[in-house]
Amino acid sequence: MTYLGAGPAPNPVIQAALAQAPILVAVDGGVAHAAALGAVPSHILGDLDSQPDALPPAFSDIPVTHIPEQESTDFDKALRTVPADLALGVGFLGGRVDHELACFHTLLRHAHRNVLLVSETDVVTLAPPRAVLRLPQKTRLSLFPMQPVRMTTTGLRWPLTAEWLDPHDRIGTSNSVDAPRVTIEASDPACLVIAPAEHLAELIEYRRQSEGWPEKRA
């Protein structure tokens, strides 16, 4: 499922996501992007504080869910309300930095799901416990810890062997692929994996091959 937010979302990026996850959910102001593209969403939801005043006639029968609470992001609301096995978020990166950070937080909250954020330049997802990623050699690949996490990797220019990454200390940005097969193993659901946007399909396969993290229960 593709979740379309109100942030920067060029049509080619939306179309690339829809090619992988063709059901569209418009998240608040993302409905304007959908209308501009001529794509009809299956659902519109959010706190609805940034929707356009008028919607196209084709949108008149679409279910609308108003979620006024302000304790979570619209992206988080969307993942909770209309869950999917594969969730691609477009229009959530490249705008306000605080919105971006909140969406990275949402990746951690939904670590049990296959969630990827897609922009014109990057794909961002959460590293599962252990999985294999296949990318062309020399492809940029970054690991960013959201909290201390022990990482083991192979197939990168600078591999890790049960080493700690920590946002207060050592991070793993601007690494690159050095072998046909990259393995990434994480001790906890806490490390972002960032790759060029043209490798969306490979990142989806990377997430889908792992059992993922257990769902946290309240």
PLM regions: where:
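N-terminal nucleotide-binding beta1-loop-alpha1 segment
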Residues: M1-P8
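Acidic/Gly/His-enriched mid-domain segments of enzyme catalytic cores or analogous surface patches
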Residues: A17-Q20, V25, G29-E120
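Residues on the solvent-exposed faces and adjacent turns
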Residues: A6, S119, P145
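Long, charged alpha-helical interface segments
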Residues: L126-A218
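Active-site glycine-rich loop that binds ribose-phosphate moieties when present
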Residues: A9, Q70-K77, T125-P128, L165-R170
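Short N-terminal binding/cap micro-motifs at the start of the first secondary-structure element
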Residues: P10-V13, H33, E202
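Non-catalytic interaction surface on structured domains
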Residues: P10, A16-Q20, G212-A218
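Short, well-ordered, mixed-charge alpha-helical segments that flank or form enzyme active sites
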Residues: N11, R96-E100, V124-A127
